[in-house]
């Protein structure tokens, strides 16, 4: 997106502000289609937890993408947005069984990741189809906070319990039709993907009614020029090879599901702030902006890198600075970066803000959440209003 368009959006709608370029989402989807074109039968499901604005979800749905939901609320939002129920996969973690029952009543597919929840499911829905999330015992991903497939992770059925599942399936106490794996996010080493792919296809041979394998997400995008990324063609080739082996060994053809979140929407998003003050100290040049981790949590939570552009002065000499928020915490958004000279009132844009940006925002310090805009068909459209004080108070009950 051009700097001129982003600056115009900030001037017209105020800051802080999230802006999404929907054409980039479609472009990312086309990359996946091209990479997976040799797979016999596959489906892309979007991870709703990364960005759940209904306008964005409807745009994604119109691309004929399915939905990965991790809460009953995401399931309901998906249905409201028009996703077909059989193309919504509900993958909860540690939820009360009442939530699973509600999802079942709504007609979506269920993917469970604990023996206890699977036993409850089999008692309530004998021999109904179910998908199961496996923990492959693989450490993969950009850092420990986004690595979720290792042996100490809370996610998935550990390998030592796989035989219990196979026995339950053989005894017709459960009807396993799908297997799911997700090892982590920002995976660049294809051998880490390959380990999980080989393992899940091997396990799949043990289940008599298996129909699908869900390989989760984890595809890494570059966050700055020269940054590493997942080699999509190598990844697709590894999937094809294991699927072909499976077909040759079993005579069955499986549906392969992928669940990208960040890959589809991260690059489409821009988070724009305004500079309140510049505060110099002995060792730092602090740029204080009108936002913080209440709006943009990833840099603080994950130490994630987001390139910053000075929209007001993009081509001046670069100076080292640290961008901090207005929250009464240590909310550093970018540390010791070289950015075009910044002045009070300048507009700063954080790139790759489409995933886990607004969705992880909060009202901490009683701050209002920002508006969301999208760029579609060469026009800027508001897709969420900025909150007001009434929004903060509307669910509170004054007892005095």
What are these regions (language model features)?
Residues 3, 253-400:
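Charged (often Lys/Glu-rich) extended helix/loop segments that serve as interaction or gating elements
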Residues 127-139:
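Glycine-rich, aromatic-flanked loop segments that form ligand/cofactor-binding clefts
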Residues 136-277, 339:
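Active-site loop/helix belt of alpha/beta enzymes
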Residues 25, 49, 71, 103, ...:
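Conserved, mostly hydrophobic/aromatic
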Residues 1-109, 115-128, 167, 171-175, ...:
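A charged N-terminal "starter" segment
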Residues 5, 21-24, 28, 32, ...:
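General structural feature for long, well-ordered alpha-helical segments within catalytic domains
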Residues 24, 48-52, 73-74, 94-96, ...:
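Active-site-proximal loop/turn and secondary-structure-junction residues that shape catalytic pockets
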Residues 66, 89, 111, 131-133, ...:
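Structured core elements
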